[in-house]
């Protein structure tokens, strides 16, 4: 072919537009939501030379083969666990069903694959220092098995401290398993993992599928943060492993985040969630430990593990159920506020029912496009009667929901489409007034350090900023 021919450029543009039409049709047939399909199809049709490559990286939602493979792996894992008598939860599950507060969340028993269980102990861990002090102290006491899973692990001061601790426990004969997300931890050097492997730690990356093409996929990430030590103590929440989570990022410091420490029968659910992800990555089961006995009292907890391979959109349905069940208040904190139409409508309806609806979001951006889209949704929420606050001291990264007087949820799920439909997430639902009071006290402290967004803020926003926000919202279904 004569690349200098005057027709070559025209042929090339024609081919790109043809590929754009094919990709647009692909998006229409495969993207789960109408908003997402439109957000992809229109630019693919009109400006494919700008959107084809981003669609290959961020879109390509026909992951039916991937979803089928993930479900098959989960099935194989549970078959392998069948002989372990892994769910001796009858008494704890029956006790949980008697709770009136949990009964108000009528969809939860069927929404989660794991039951609500009684007789757990929970402890609120506010910010990075308290969280990692508790995690490191628990690992120090490990005797048998340590399970560690994070979306992000950095090879910095905190990451190296975790590495050395895990190496020391492995040298003592403890079985150590580490799982991290390949995209979230893209900056983690291979030498970090190799040092752990050489020291006897089993470490693997969570990837979507094998193959050259899929290495460019950034969807279907594993956003979960789980640590379980000897089946006796566990941790989940919003922190990853990096110095910024200790407030050492100058532009985002102080970092505001929340974790929860857990003991009791619900730890079996955390281990089961880890086992599913580990089995997907390795086709092997990690050791799973149940204590000989549980305490006779404690709080009700339910682990809500969600992901794109679920038969239904577990994460978004949880937010809907939590908001619809509220009779007095629903407070939500999230670093990203990009609700879909159903969740946004639920928030508006809650306001009309007289519920105290509050949303706490950051005042500083870590992703500018997401921040712009969040800002527009915040302005619209304020006009609908939702009280929206911006946390002032530093970057807010916690993911917390408080419903009425008894129900709270802390985990890894953000209030955005990525958590709703693309990421693997885990949230701990707790039904207990005393713990909810602690969460309320924590959030009240946050609100005192926040500035409430007003209708005037929207009117005072420059038109160019408003235009940027609206463009960001157009692509919000694919953010």
UniProtKB/Swiss-Prot annotation:
Active site: 223, 225, 230, 397, 399, 404
SMART domains reported for this sequence: PLDc
Keywords: Cell inner membrane, Cell membrane, Lipid biosynthesis, Lipid metabolism, Membrane, Phospholipid biosynthesis, Phospholipid metabolism, Repeat, Transferase, Transmembrane, Transmembrane helix
GO molecular function: cardiolipin synthase activity
Enzyme Commission identifier(s): 2.7.8.-
Chief localisation class: membrane
One Pfam family recorded for the sequence: PLDc_2
Job description of the protein: Catalyzes the reversible phosphatidyl group transfer from one phosphatidylglycerol molecule to another to form cardiolipin (CL) (diphosphatidylglycerol) and glycerol.
PANTHER family: CARDIOLIPIN SYNTHASE, PHOSPHOLIPASE D
Name under which the protein is recorded: Cardiolipin synthase A
Organism: Pseudomonas putida (strain GB-1)
